[in-house]
């Protein structure tokens, strides 16, 4: 019985104390207006859960900052979008996460909305792989 209680407490501790915010492979759609179509590329980004809470009593002296799984460090990679006009810039630079953590969402560099456009959004009807 004690081992069962220990196992239960260990699982609770693991769920509360250990975040599962980690690097994951995703496919994003990139587009250039000058090229009139989208391409899909594979990249790395952060995904997972972070410990957070929403207080019932809102204390103005203590700001309520919700933590989200976001990048700690990233690099930029560039891909050439095929089929662009000769006068157009066919290079597209996109971020690749190299390290993740649970922290405040930085709206200067990240879409912090509840429902953004999503990684597969394309404003053109033609999509190339």
Swiss-Prot record:
Recorded GO CC terms: cytoplasm; extracellular space; follicle-stimulating hormone complex
Superkingdom to which the source organism belongs: Eukaryota
Disulphide connectivity of cysteines: 21-69, 35-84, 38-122, 46-100, 50-102, 105-112
Subcellular location field: Secreted
GO MF entry, a single one: follicle-stimulating hormone activity
GO biological process: follicle-stimulating hormone signaling pathway; G protein-coupled receptor signaling pathway; positive regulation of bone resorption; positive regulation of gene expression; positive regulation of steroid biosynthetic process; regulation of osteoclast differentiation; regulation of signaling receptor activity; Sertoli cell proliferation
Main location as per UniProt: secreted
Signal peptide: 1-20
Record keyword tRNA-binding present: no
Positions annotated with a glycan in the UniProt record: 25, 42
Keyword set, alphabetical order: Disulfide bond, Glycoprotein, Hormone, Secreted, Signal
Quaternary structure, from the entry: Heterodimer. The active follitropin is a heterodimer composed of an alpha chain/CGA shared with other hormones and a unique beta chain/FSHB shown here.
Entry similarity comment: Belongs to the glycoprotein hormones subunit beta family.
Described function: Together with the alpha chain CGA constitutes follitropin, the follicle-stimulating hormone, and provides its biological specificity to the hormone heterodimer. Binds FSHR, a G protein-coupled receptor, on target cells to activate downstream signaling pathways. Follitropin is involved in follicle development and spermatogenesis in reproductive organs.
Name the record gives this protein: Follitropin subunit beta
Taxonomic source organism: Sus scrofa
């Amino acid at each position: 019985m004690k081992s069962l209680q220990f196992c239960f407490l260990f699982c609770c501790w693991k769920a509360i104390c250990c975040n599962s915010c980690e690097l994951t492979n995703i496919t994003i759609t990139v587009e250039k207006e000058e090229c009139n179509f989208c391409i899909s590329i594979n990249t790395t980004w952060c995904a997972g859960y972070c410990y957070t809470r929403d207080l019932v009593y809102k204390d103005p002296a203590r700001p309520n900052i919700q933590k989200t799984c976001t990048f700690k460090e990233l690099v930029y990679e560039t891909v050439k979008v095929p089929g662009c006009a000769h006068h157009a810039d066919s290079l597209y630079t996109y971020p690749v996460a190299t390290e993740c953590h649970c922290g405040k969402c930085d709206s200067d560099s990240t879409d912090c909305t509840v429902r953004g456009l999503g990684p597969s959004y394309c404003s053109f009807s033609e999509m190339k792989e």
